[in-house]
Amino acid sequence: MVDVLGGRRLVTREGTVVEAEVALQNKVVALYFAAGRCSPSRDFTPLLCDFYTELVSEARRPAPFEVVFVSADGSAEEMLDFMRELHGSWLALPFHDPYRHELKKRYEITAIPKLVVIKQNGAVITNKGRKQIRERGLACFQNWVEAADVFQNFSG
């Protein structure tokens, strides 16, 4: 379980609530800081969606990977609209959870979109997940898995 999200509840784009401990157990986690009103976010989100779908949803053996959306939208309604329109079937920190702001501060988010890939203890594997996906596609995931220390036997 990713320590930084311990005790938190996450939501799906359909509104289902899940416990972070269960959903993130033994997975590489990417915190996705973005907003629907941000054109770079709207540009990158479909690429992230394809990346996630290939690794998790459509894979013969789903990869140990999860995205957690940390919204920078102006309202819960904007967040949900963005999630329903462009997001993959990943998770999100609820809009009204004040922890969103703590995560932005902890991971020094000064611009969006930003994809921060973290270890189970919350340490950063890379804060350049967006760039790595754009440049290397699925190949970057193996590096993340190796850096995470937990999933060394995964082969994509």
Swiss-Prot record:
PANTHER family: NUCLEOREDOXIN-LIKE PROTEIN 2 (PTHR46762:SF1)
Expression across tissues: Both isoforms are expressed in retina, in the photoreceptor layer, and throughout the olfactory sensory neuron layer of the nasal epithelium, in neurons. Also expressed at low levels in brain and testis.
Disruption phenotype: At 10 months of age, mutant animals show signs of photoreceptor dysfunction. The progressive loss of cone function is followed by cone cell death, while in rods, the outer segment length id reduced, but not rod cell death is not observed. At 12 months, mice present a stronger age-dependent impairment of fine odor discrimination than their wild-type counterparts.
Gene Ontology biological-process entries: photoreceptor cell maintenance; sensory perception of smell; visual perception
Organism of derivation: Mus musculus
Gene3D superfamilies in the cross-refs: Glutaredoxin
Protein family (similarity comment): Belongs to the nucleoredoxin family.
CDD domains with a match to the protein in the record: TryX_like_family
SUPFAM superfamilies in alphabetical order: Thioredoxin-like
Organism lineage: Eukaryota, Metazoa, Chordata, Craniata, Vertebrata
Coiled-coil residues: none
Its job: May be involved in the maintenance of both the function and the viability of sensory neurons, including photoreceptors and olfactory neurons. In the retina, isoform 1 may be required for rod function and isoform 2 for cone viability and function.
Protein name: Nucleoredoxin-like protein 2
Name of the gene this protein is made from: Nxnl2
Domain Thioredoxin span(s) in chain numbering: 9-147
One Pfam family here: Thioredoxin_8
